[in-house]
Every structure is written in structure tokens, then in C-alpha cells.
């Protein structure tokens, strides 16, 4: 239900840049950033006034009053993820509707485990957390299982080594994935 209300707000005009002054942002007004935010509001209003003078308004361009948003989370609790999985009636493909993007955690990415098995069956983009215990050949095999067609954009490797380990582990992982010719997106979790 939270996602549905966000969808309604994002498409129903709440995100309209023309209403930036009306958004309930009391927390900003009480913060040290209030002056900067007010300046930003004013710049947006000036830009919109200029665009309107040029004939570009939200009457003709929905990008001025709607936004797209994407959600993600760790696919940790499999009974929940399974209950949120639906079949696309036009393609027959399965999608986890609990989020647009789900990831497998560092402690649950066993090749023969339930989390990999679940994610193997859905069409969502999938992230794989990679920490100091990750072995490049293991991560490569998981990528191949989750993305057998090696589609671009399907797999994101989320490095989570910590500042003290990143130089030791990340280059090996990058070389291992590159050697296998796998299409992945690289992301960093600074935790």
C-alpha cells in the first residue's frame, strides 16, 4: 500500500515543480539548509516562468508534474518475496512486485541456496552483495546462473568491502568478472 500511495503522489500532481513552494517541508525550514533550499525554490520558479514564457508548461509536458521512482531492497525473507511474486499475463514471466530491484546479501548468496534459486526465477534486475569473503569465480558463477543470457542491466554487483579492504579485494573481483566477459553494473555500498 505504501508503494501505491507513492505511485499516486508521483503521477497525481504532487510532484509538480510548480508546487515546490507548497510542499510540506517544515523539517527543511528548521534546518541550517533552509536558506539554500529557499534559493533553490526560487531558481526553480524562475526557470519554470521562463519555460512558460516559451510555451513549455505542464499542460503539454507531463515531465513537469510527474516523476518516476524506483524501489529496491534485499530479498531476505523469502516467504514475503514469494508472496509478492506475480506472473506477467502478457509474457508469462515472473516479477517480484515488492521492489523494482532486489539484491542478494553477502551472507545469503550461496549458489545452491534459496535466495539464488528464488532470484533465478524472476525477471527483476538483481543485485549481488560482494564482501571480503567473495571469491571472483563464485560471483561469476552466480552471475551466470542468475543471468544465463548475459543481458546488460540484469545484474549489479554491489561491492561492500569497507575502506580497509577495498584495495585488497575489489581489483581481483573486477578482473575475475571481466575475464569471464560478464555484463554487470558496478555499484558501491560504502558500509
Language-model regions: role of each:
Residues 1-162:
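Active-site-facing alpha/beta catalytic cores
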Residues 143-191:
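Catalytic-face loop-and-helix region of soluble metabolic enzyme cores
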Amino acid at each position: 500500500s505504501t508503494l501505491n500511495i507513492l505511485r499516486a503522489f508521483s503521477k497525481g500532481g504532487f510532484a509538480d515543480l510548480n508546487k515546490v513552494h507548497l510542499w510540506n517541508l517544515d523539517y527543511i525550514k528548521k534546518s541550517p539548509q533552509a536558506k539554500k533550499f529557499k534559493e533553490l525554490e526560487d531558481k526553480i520558479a524562475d526557470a519554470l516562468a521562463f519555460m512558460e514564457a516559451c510555451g513549455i508548461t505542464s499542460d503539454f509536458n507531463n515531465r513537469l508534474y510527474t516523476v518516476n521512482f524506483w524501489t529496491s531492497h534485499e530479498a531476505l525473507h523469502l516467504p514475503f518475496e514469494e508472496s509478492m511474486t506475480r506472473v506477467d499475463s502478457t509474457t508469462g514471466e515472473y516479477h517480484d512486485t515488492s521492489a523494482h530491484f532486489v539484491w542478494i546479501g553477502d551472507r545469503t548468496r550461496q549458489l545452491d541456496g534459496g535466495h539464488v534459486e528464488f532470484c533465478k526465477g524472476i525477471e527483476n534486475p538483481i543485485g549481488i552483495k560482494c564482501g571480503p569473503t567473495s571469491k571472483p569465480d563464485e560471483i561469476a558463477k552466480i552471475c551466470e546462473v542468475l543471468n544465463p543470457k548475459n543481458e546488460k542491466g540484469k545484474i549489479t554487483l554491489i561491492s561492500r568491502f569497507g575502506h580497509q579492504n577495498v584495495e585488497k579485494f575489489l581489483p581481483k573481483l573486477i578482473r575475475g568478472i571481466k575475464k569471464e566477459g560478464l555484463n554487470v553494473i558496478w555499484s558501491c555500498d560504502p558500509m
